[in-house]
Amino acid sequence: MHPKRSSQGDGSVTKPVRTSDRLRRRPKLHGRSYLYYSSPNMLHNRKRNTKTRTAASQIAKMLHKGNRPARASNAAPIASDLRRSTRKRRISVNLEDYTDSSGAEDEDMMSPAYRTLRRRVHKNFSTSKSRKDMDAELAPRREGLRPRRSTTIANKRLKTESGADQDTSEEKDGQDETENGNELDDADDGENEVEAEDEGNGEDEGDGEDEGEEDGDDDEEGDEEQEGRKRYDLRNRAEVRRMPTGEINKQQQPRSPRRVLHQGMGTRVGRDGRRGGSRPHKRHRFTRTDDSDDSLLVDELDQGPAIPWARGGNRSGAPWLFGGLDTYGSSSLGLNVGASGWGHQSDGLAALTSGVQTAGPSSKGGADIQPLQINEDINFDDIGGLSEYINDLKEMVFFPLLYPEFFASYSITPPRGVLLCGPPGTGKTLIARALACAASKAGQKVSFYMRKGADVLSKWVGEAERQLKLLFEEAQRNQPSIIFFDEIDGLAPVRSSKQEQIHNSIVSTLLALMDGLDSRGQVVLIGATNRVDAIDGALRRPGRFDREFNFSLPGCEARAEILDIHTRKWKHPPTRELKEELAATCVGYCGADLKALCTEAAIRAFREKYPQVYTSDDKYAIDVGLVNVEKSHFVEAMSAITPAAHRGSVVQSRPLSPVVLPCLHRHLLESMSLISDIFPSSATSSELTKLSILTFGSAIPLVYRPRLLLLGGEGVGLDHLGPAILHELEKFPIHSLGLPSLLSDPGAKTPEEALVHIFSEARRTTPSILYIPMFNNWWENAHEQLRAVFLTLLEELPSNLPILLLATSYGELSDMEEQSVFDNRSVYTVDKPSSEDRSLFFDRLIEAALSVISGLNGKPDGPQPLPELPKVPKEPTGPKPAEVKAKVEAEQHALRRLRMCLRDVCNRILYDKRFSAFHFPVTDEDAPNYRSIIQIPMDTATLLQRVDTGQYLTCTPFLQDVDLIVRNAKAYNGDDYAGARIVSRAYELRDVVHGMLSQMDPALLTYCDKIAAEGGPSLIPDDLSGSILGLAPVVQMGTVTRTSARLRNVQPEVNLDRDYEGLKKPKKTTDAVSIDSAADKSQNQDSGQEMPSPDAANPQSAAPSPTDGDREDQSEPPSKEASAEDMSGDSCKGPAAKSDKEISSRTESVKGVFMERTDNYSIPQMERLYTRIMKGVLETLDKGLRDDDNNPKHSILRFLSEFAQHQANF
């Protein structure tokens, strides 16, 4: 039966020759140019070996858990579990008849790879000899291959137990074999190469497995493929529709026209085709399994549409109906689909995916590595109070560019990194922007890159590190450059076990980029943070951040400078005295707070000047120059603003209030004198510091444990004096050690931990101040451990370390228990106010009481009616020139897109030979009687001409002309058999045109219908055809009287200058009257100065005019009244002088009574007395205003005298 088989006989086993895939392919029956060798019994063997199928019921019975056979051996699975590259290849022909006697090394290729299950089991289980042959043929062809699970042994076990039902399944198996053969024919018909396939897939699979990139995820039984290659969700993004085995057509079918249209007449399927059925399925490029993640991030869709009429072009789009017209004609003109009006269904994927990244950044990884465009209006002159830091930044950026020879001569590298730390609003970001702007103006362009906090963070693993690397590489290419990391604590936090691993990786990458093996070049790094303790400590060393600038809150002089910067562009800036007073008052204000203060004060001044704008929606004609910002506006603004430093913590420093200033000013001066002696850092000059330096880096100690205790009894004003001293020393960092501060520290769990943290921070920011309010209570209530920690930390401080310990304590010096901390020389005793202090206090009190009158005199008695302001004439309600031009451009663009689509349709029809009868007009030679039958001829060329001339505003007239072609064909050809073909082509033409126009963008069609409904496209007027910017002067000149009169050809016969002055003068006086009616006395004087000078030069010409109104009565007597006042001035001096003497005498008497009553008064009692007296003064003035009191000073003095006479008030 099989005389050539090597597994039979008694002789030595001869192994077959390794055959190639070309010989193992089954012969094709449609004319392939291959030479196949076959034996006479080839077809007979194939027909006989078909009835080997096991019934499904028997297979289910054998698969039952109790009926499963034991594993036969371990060698077989290992031998059969091979990688895909060495799997047994299924062969569709029987090559058993080919032998070779050259050697026995390739025995595995002798037995046919495509054989029914029954023959395989019979062969492998007949004898032990054949079992050895089976082990040999399953051995790998080379060593080191990874085993794979196979289903061959399971099939053998199933067949061993299926002998009872073999006869019942032979018929069905024959049918299946025939069907599988058909599928193999179809699969081989579409591919010229034999694909590697696992032997255990069985005969039911009609297509082989791909070599590595095609249809690994499209197999119906892909268990082996799943084992061989891991499956990634990111790589297999596209959804693959899997067809059940039962739905696959089991019979050989001829190629349909649709299949020919999709893939052509050839038999080869491209690498984007998917096999497994009767036709290949086109797969999008994004669904290939060989695309890696990186390629998906940066690659774009490269499947461009082809020219529609090119016969050899790639028709990747869907066909136009059945006419062979595709949808990509728009691209042939160099336009994309979005620019034309097409909106085909198959364009959705290309339009959405072309140029769009699927899972990440762009070609640069999504990193915003372009240099930042800096506002050139910002410079160092706009920054106040940071002059020393500005010079340090210039050393880092400008000097290496301007003076490189200095650094080269000393072989040093200039500092390349600086860390800006400080409270919010102190100018960290502003100084970086000013530096970038100034660097660009220095002569050589400096690139500026800015990153804010966690901008570089990404959800993709490793993307943040990649963006940092790209940023540094780009900065090195464009050096000199500056990289500014704003809020760097969010990018490089402290690395710890509690922190996320992603931050640790980012910090490590940043550290390596800042100071790694590669030189950074001329790249300056600037980091800004208000949480310097939150960033990683490895950043804060030379080589990375070489310098640290601590931006503290601005001092008094710095605040005055900042106020001057923000108000120097005002028309009426505040006086120097006012700015110094505001700077002294705004304690704890940062630069941003001072800017907000100026803004709020200006808005309040505008609200006071023009309150009418808040009650009307109309725009008034206002004069901005009349708005003047005064001190009261700043005071109101300060009450509405909470400084940023006051929100997070309590500010300990504040100046002395005007109430207690007379009583404590003497103690403040004496305390500051003591501090200047024990803490010379507050007054030490740079020259003195240079003289104190000795050899070997040592210096003369100028400080020895600076400590000061303010000691006094109850009511001496220590709660005012301590903060006032801190206010004078506000340029130094102040750290509070009070019990509330220790207990409220969010970063400490115990007071001892908070105390240690404050001491370490004070040592880091020397010179600094440690402040302990109410030290006696602190020492009494602190437990022993806290005291021990406090004393230990004090002793650990070096004796010459400039850290001032300032404390306040109530009690006597003899009773003080904390002598171990403060010695007698470090104690300053504060006593109660003396008689001189109280005398000065009451002088200020009476002065303040009398000054209230001057503030009330300028205010009206009640609410006054607001004057009406002239309204600005409303602009024409018509569209603006820019809107008209934009509308015209939009309409022209829409009509252009419509013409492109219609022109494309006409060109497609002209290139289609099926409609050649309708391409051009019918000539008389072709049909002499055509003109007599058809009154309105129509053809494709005429349609194209009308499209080019813009006669179609919508698709409706175009379709009407296409319908006219159909009607003309029916009318001329009639119902005869000869013309029926032409009429049918006309109907086909109309259907094709309708089909193509249905693919257009619906929004475009709707917009074109709107244009047609409005009467056609809008036209640009002649005056708008030029530049729109030139229209404004023309409109303004059109409002002038002389210009309009000249345009109307009016001959002016009068003197234009005189007439213009006559018309202009009443208008100005009328406006002045309307404005002056609501202005105060000082503003009336200002408006009076703006009157025309001719009236002032000629007093006689100041005759009453109808426009003067209420001023008519005051126009004649001013000279007489002025002369009368001048004559009576000397006589009035006598009574006025007597009145002033009487007031001063009464004031001294009231003051003497107050001095007697307030003997031995404390500071709180003086404050309470001040408050009661000022409240009574205000009530007295209010009562005097209601009673029409003509002399409020006497009323105030009478109240003060009565108040001092009553003993109960003291």
UniProtKB/Swiss-Prot annotation:
Composition-biased stretches, type Acidic residues, lie in: 97-109, 167-226
Compositional bias segments (type: Polar residues): 1-11, 1080-1090
Which GO molecular function terms does the record list? ATP binding; ATP hydrolysis activity; histone binding
Region spans: Disordered:
1-32, 63-291, 856-883, 1057-1151
Q: Which SMART domains match?
A: AAA (SM00382), BROMO (SM00297)
In terms of domain of life, where is this protein from? Answer: Eukaryota
* Gene3D superfamilies, sorted: 1.10.8.60, Bromodomain-like, P-loop containing nucleotide triphosphate hydrolases
Q: Where is the composition biased (Basic residues)?
A: 276-286
Asked whether the UniProt record includes Nucleotide-binding among its keywords, one would answer yes
The positions annotated for binding ATP are G422, P423, P424, G425, T426, G427, K428, T429
Sorted keywords for this record are: ATP-binding, Bromodomain, Nucleotide-binding
The annotated regions of Basic and acidic residues compositional bias extend over 130-146, 227-244, 1057-1070, 1108-1123, 1138-1151
Q: What PROSITE patterns would the database entry show? A: AAA (PS00674), BROMODOMAIN_1 (PS00633), BROMODOMAIN_2 (PS50014)
Q: Where is the Bromo domain?
A: 897-1000
Q: Which PANTHER family match?
A: AAA DOMAIN-CONTAINING, TAT-BINDING HOMOLOG 7
Q: Which family does it belong to?
A: Belongs to the AAA ATPase family.
State the name under which the record lists this protein: ATPase family AAA domain-containing protein At1g05910
Task: Identify the species of origin.
Answer: Arabidopsis thaliana (Mouse-ear cress)
